[in-house]
């Protein structure tokens, strides 16, 4: 795919038409964290379940200062009409608004710039549609995480929320989150922190797992 973003790249300050009007991306983000996520097409089954779950979790993202914005190659008019279906799927009033805007990228200009097109999935005209991409940007507008799923596999938005919590925690504290970590679980002390400094940084205690190598790199501490 042409285009695309690498970790640490700054988000392009694009302009786009959305379900809340025309936006400039950096102005939309402000000082918040941001999630930009694309889907293949409106009025399709997997996408409806995905955006339905994203809408359900929107309050959890909002209370963590995260702004959400979706994107596909459909028009604003289609986005608004489809939003009724998404709300109905969630068992709510079938209104045209969601807790986040959706970008109209009929031209595919943004999808090309951001490397979002799936060459294996095409529309009725034989043109590629957007894959299931997730970009997470920090308050500095730089890319902190990217996820790329094919059209046939829906994403787990609870996992995306878990990742946001980890990213925000590790941006503030000198820790890392281990496999299958959940909010409130113990975290790992970074291996470049000397033992004496670790004791001062983590007053709740540092617990080291003894290993056959004798190396003391598996160090846990309660979540700060």
UniProtKB/Swiss-Prot annotation:
Disulfide bonds: none annotated. It catalyses: a hydroperoxide + 2 glutathione = an alcohol + glutathione disulfide + H2O; a 1,2-diacyl-sn-glycero-3-phosphocholine + H2O = a 1-acyl-sn-glycero-3-phosphocholine + a fatty acid + H(+); a 1-acyl-sn-glycero-3-phosphocholine + an acyl-CoA = a 1,2-diacyl-sn-glycero-3-phosphocholine + CoA; 1-hexadecanoyl-sn-glycero-3-phosphocholine + hexadecanoyl-CoA = 1,2-dihexadecanoyl-sn-glycero-3-phosphocholine + CoA. Thiol-specific peroxidase that catalyzes the reduction of hydrogen peroxide and organic hydroperoxides to water and alcohols, respectively. Can reduce H(2)O(2) and short chain organic, fatty acid, and phospholipid hydroperoxides. Also has phospholipase activity, and can therefore either reduce the oxidized sn-2 fatty acyl group of phospholipids (peroxidase activity) or hydrolyze the sn-2 ester bond of phospholipids (phospholipase activity). These activities are dependent on binding to phospholipids at acidic pH and to oxidized phospholipds at cytosolic pH. The modification N6-succinyllysine is found at residue 209. One of its GO terms (biological process) is response to oxidative stress. Residues 5-169 form the Thioredoxin domain. Gene3D superfamilies: Antioxidant, Horf6, Chain A, domain2, Glutaredoxin. Its EC number is 1.11.1.27, 3.1.1.4, 2.3.1.23. The active site is a conserved redox-active cysteine residue, the peroxidatic cysteine (C(P)), which makes the nucleophilic attack on the peroxide substrate. The peroxide oxidizes the C(P)-SH to cysteine sulfenic acid (C(P)-SOH), which then reacts with another cysteine residue, the resolving cysteine (C(R)), to form a disulfide bridge. The disulfide is subsequently reduced by an appropriate electron donor to complete the catalytic cycle. In this 1-Cys peroxiredoxin, no C(R) is present and C(P) instead forms a disulfide with a cysteine from another protein or with a small thiol molecule. SUPFAM superfamilies: Thioredoxin-like. It is found in: Cytoplasm; Lysosome. This is Peroxiredoxin-6. The modification Phosphotyrosine is found at residue 89. The modification Phosphothreonine is found at residues 44, 177. Keywords: Acetylation, Antioxidant, Cytoplasm, Hydrolase, Lipid degradation, Lipid metabolism, Lysosome, Multifunctional enzyme, Oxidoreductase, Peroxidase, Phosphoprotein, Redox-active center, Transferase. The record marks 32 as: Important for phospholipase activity. It comes from Sus scrofa (Pig). The lineage of its organism: Eukaryota, Metazoa, Chordata, Craniata, Vertebrata. Belongs to the peroxiredoxin family. Prx6 subfamily. One of its GO terms (molecular function) is phospholipase A2 activity. One of its GO terms (cellular component) is cytoplasm. The active site is at residues 47, 140. Irreversibly inactivated by overoxidation of Cys-47 to sulfinic acid (Cys-SO(2)H) and sulfonic acid (Cys-SO(3)H) forms upon oxidative stress. The modification N6-acetyllysine is found at residues 63, 209. InterPro entries: AhpC/TSA, Peroxiredoxin_AhpC-typ, Peroxiredoxin_C, PRX_1cys, Thioredoxin-like_sf, Thioredoxin_domain. Homodimer. Interacts with GSTP1; mediates PRDX6 glutathionylation and regeneration. Interacts with APEX1. Interacts with STH. May interact with FAM168B. May interact with HTR2A.
